[in-house]
Design a protein with these regions (language model features):
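Residue(s) in the substrate-gating loop at a strand-loop-helix junction
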Residues: 138
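Short C-terminal tail/terminal secondary-structure segment
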Residues: 92, 143, 222, 233-234, ...
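Substrate-binding pocket helix/loop in short-chain dehydrogenase/reductase
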Residues: 91-95, 99-107, 133, 199, ...
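Conserved glycine-rich cofactor-binding loop
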Residues: 9, 16-17
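Active-site helix of classical SDR
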Residues: 118, 154, 162
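Short, small/polar-rich loop/turn modules that mediate ligand/substrate recognition or access, typified
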Residues: 170, 175, 244-246
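Alpha-helical segment proximal to the catalytic Tyr-Lys
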Residues: 123, 167-168, 242
Length: 259
């Protein structure tokens, strides 16, 4: 199926690794041009830029001006915005140990980066008659977990924002949808200092055992691959699915068992 993404201008936040890198690769494979925002350039992202279809913008997306600077680097037109940047920091010591500074850092990256990117891109999309915004959320938006309490709260807020935006922006031809992954095979979960590493250290377990336990909680018995999340993003960004807005697609291997 031709997703009609050839020549589209796409802005991706948090594009240097994990889901963001997979999303960037997927859009390039479909013939899109990607403006990729990241705090620093990884070799994988640099290799994509060498191909000529990716412009890398090194930017701190947790700052007030960062998201706007990224959108501005795309030029006068943006067809798709993918709000992917985010980070989950496990809090094994509980709620009382989450300081105001920790709350602010989480909200700046996991919520306000998306708010600011949308604020920057909406006037551009309205001028061109429409566009698509895809927010990468988390199952923790609907499965609040004290281990990632501040992250869960931020993702719940981002999901609510996306639903509200879909109603406001729909008449302007701008579709807004969310993707909520469960555990994904990225450094956020499996890398040094990731969820499995921190949780294992707090409970005297190996990261491998923590990851295996998480995988066992899914009916598929495995983590989602970043490329699988990217494929969902492509569908939601495509004009072939032009009447899909305000939707939330969960890709969690059956982790959520409720209706």
């Amino acid at each position: 199926m031709d997703l009609d993404l050839t020549g589209r201008i796409v802005v991706v936040t948090g594009a240097s690794r994990g889901i963001g890198l997979a999303v960037t690769r997927a859009f390039v494979a479909e013939g899109a041009r990607v403006v990729a925002g990241a705090r620093s350039t990884t070799p994988e992202l640099a290799a994509l830029a060498d191909g000529g279809s990716v412009i890398v913008v090194e930017v701190d997306l947790s700052t007030h001006d960062g998201p706007g600077a990224l959108v501005a680097a795309a030029g006068p037109r943006v067809d798709v915005l993918v709000n992917n940047v985010g980070s989950a920091h496990p809090r094994p010591d509980g709620f009382l140990e989450i300081t105001d500074e920790m709350w602010r850092a989480t909200l700046e990256l996991d919520l306000m980066a998306s708010v600011r990117a949308v604020r920057a891109v909406v006037p551009i999309m309205r001028a061109y008659g429409g566009g698509a915004i895809v927010n990468i959320g988390s199952v923790n938006a609907r499965l609040p977990d004290p281990l990632v309490l501040d992250y869960s709260a931020a993702k719940a807020a981002a999901g609510s924002m996306a639903k509200s935006l879909s109603k406001e922006l729909g008449p302007h031809g701008i579709r807004v949808n969310s993707v909520d992954p469960g555990p994904v095979a990225t450094d956020l979960w499996l890398g040094k200092g990731g969820v499995a590493d921190v949780v294992g250290g707090a409970h005297g377990a190996s990261p491998e055992d923590v990851a295996a336990g998480a995988a066992a909680s899914m009916v598929t018995g495995r983590f989602t691959r970043p490329e699988e999340v990217a494929d969902v993003v492509l569908v939601l960004a495509s004009t072939r699915f032009g009447n899909v807005t305000g939707s939330n697609v969960v890709i969690d291997g059956g982790l959520i068992t409720t209706l």
